Amino acid sequence: MKLEKDNAMDRADTLEQQNKEANIRAEKAEEEVHNLQKRMQQLENDLDQVQESLLKANTQLEEKDKALSNAEGEVAALNRRIQLLEEDLERSEERLNTATTKLAEASQAADESERMRKVLENRSLSDEERMDALENQLKEARFLAEEADRKYDEVARKLAMVEADLERAEERAETGESKFVELEEELRVVGNNLKSLEVSEEKANQREEAYKEQIKTLTNKLKAAEARAEFAERSVQKLQKEVDRLEDELVNEKEKYKSITDELDQTFSELSGY
């Protein structure tokens, strides 16, 4: 009986010891559970913050993607604009070269016209001298014609006198006839001289009119050449202004393109940081 009691006491002590150990383990387990709960709560809080940060980062990333797409579209548009400007500039340069060539041709034509004008001026002076000579010849011809008319009247008067003398003196017939023949010959010569002088005067008038018409035509050509030269010069000035304007616009577009490129580089750097 005592042995059973001792065994029971030993078992009771053992169970009590086991109970104490179990309580200690339970307390440790509860403490560990509490610590785990605190850690889980902290992890949940951290997870919420991480999810919130991730949401913000995704939102910012979407905004950056939109900005990048817009910037790429603007860059593409600017590239097209620059290409169009370069093509316009090339066409303007071609027009400028064409206008420069035309201006050179017009200048050459103007120089040639100036040379022709000087030649015509010299020729005009020569023609004026010839016209003065012709006028002098014409005056002389008119004087000769008047003199011929006077001589003709005188011959006619003398002829009448000869005819009267012929009627009155048959014995002087041979002498009178011979003189009459001489007078007729003189009259014929005078008539031919008058006709020659009239033809010379008509030709001189025709040449004078031809010279005047030629001078008028050349003067009109010179004025037309000067007008073309002035027009070409104005066209070149307008083209030069257009080229200057296009160059300024191209510089502005390049500056805008550089600014956008810098902004894109900065955006890429920020995205790389995330």
Curated annotation (Swiss-Prot):
Gene3D superfamilies listed in its UniProt record: 1.20.5.170, 1.20.5.340
Q: Which Pfam families does this entry report, sorted A to Z? A: Tropomyosin (PF00261)
Please list where the region (Disordered) is annotated.
1-30
Please give the name of this protein: Tropomyosin
Segments forming a coiled coil = 1-274
* Record carries keyword Repeat: yes
Family note: Belongs to the tropomyosin family.
Q: What is known of its domains?
A: The molecule is in a coiled coil structure that is formed by 2 polypeptide chains. The sequence exhibits a prominent seven-residues periodicity.
Q: Which organism is it from?
A: Panulirus stimpsoni
